[in-house]
UniProtKB/Swiss-Prot annotation:
It comes from the Bacteria. Keywords: DNA-binding, Repressor, Transcription, Transcription regulation. It comes from Brucella suis biovar 1 (strain 1330). Residues 9-69 form the HTH tetR-type domain. One of its GO terms (molecular function) is transcription cis-regulatory region binding. Pfam families: TetR_C_2 (PF08361), TetR_N (PF00440). The keyword Transcription applies. Residues 32-51 bind DNA. SUPFAM superfamilies: Homeodomain-like (SSF46689), Tetracyclin repressor-like, C-terminal domain (SSF48498). This is HTH-type transcriptional repressor BepR.
Length: 209
């Protein structure tokens, strides 16, 4: 009997969920398709029906995950907003809030940053991660250039430098929170720090009283 599309989709989902757990526990490089198949309760043949190899599985996990960076991109897409620094701050805080409540994001972020060595068969993943970072950086720069044109960005800052610092801070916060076993309130502390940094980016005449 032929499998329905729904059944095939369920099997594919089960494989991806299993892979996430195996990668989290064993590390991507050390994990095998046999382990993933066993965890998912399927055969290796079922895995090869949906994926070419382990790299394809990992790329699929990255591709379907909703990352904080993508949340920022969705919320801050309007470069013509009259208050770009406010939009940028809101977007970053929204990303932190989403991450703090989404265990799936946390698992995938942990795998990407702590459970994979990007050598050998995993080397191609670097290009995808670089592309993601470049997209977010370009978005940040776009918003900050609007602030610059409006005279809202302090003269000692360039849009590029400010964007790089903000992006590094977001990644650093997420890493520190996970490394520290969530020992602090990501939303409260993150929001305060981001607000302080955004304030430091404002030209004196544009700092809210």
């Amino acid at each position: 009997m032929r499998r329905t599309k729904a059944e095939a989709a369920e099997t594919r989902e089960a494989i991806l969920l299993a892979a996430e757990q195996v990668f989290l526990e064993r590390g991507v490089n050390q994990s095998t398709l046999t382990e993933i198949a066993c965890y998912a309760g399927v055969t290796r043949g079922a895995i090869y029906f949906h994926f070419e190899d382990k790299l394809d599985i990992f790329q699929s996990i990255i591709g379907r995950a909703r990352f904080p960076q993508e949340e920022i991109m969705l919320q801050a897409a309007r470069f013509d907003h009259p208050n770009p620094l406010h939009i940028l701050e809101q977007s970053i805080v929204a990303a932190l809030e989403l991450f703090a409540t989404d265990e799936r994001q946390q698992v995938v972020f942990t795998i990407i940053n702590q459970r994979c060595e990007y050598v050998g068969e995993m080397a191609p993943v670097i290009d995808r991660l670089k592309e993601m970072r470049s997209d977010v950086l370009a978005l940040f720069i776009g918003l900050l250039k609007v602030a610059e044109r409006r005279g809202e960005l302090a003269s000692e800052w360039s849009a590029e430098t400010a964007a790089q610092i903000l992006l590094a801070m977001v990644g650093g916060f997420l890493n520190e929170w996970l490394h520290g076993e969530k020992g602090f309130d990501l939303i409260i502390h993150g929001s305060r720090v981001i607000s302080t940094v955004i304030q430091s980016l404002r030209a004196p005449a544009n700092i809210p009283q």
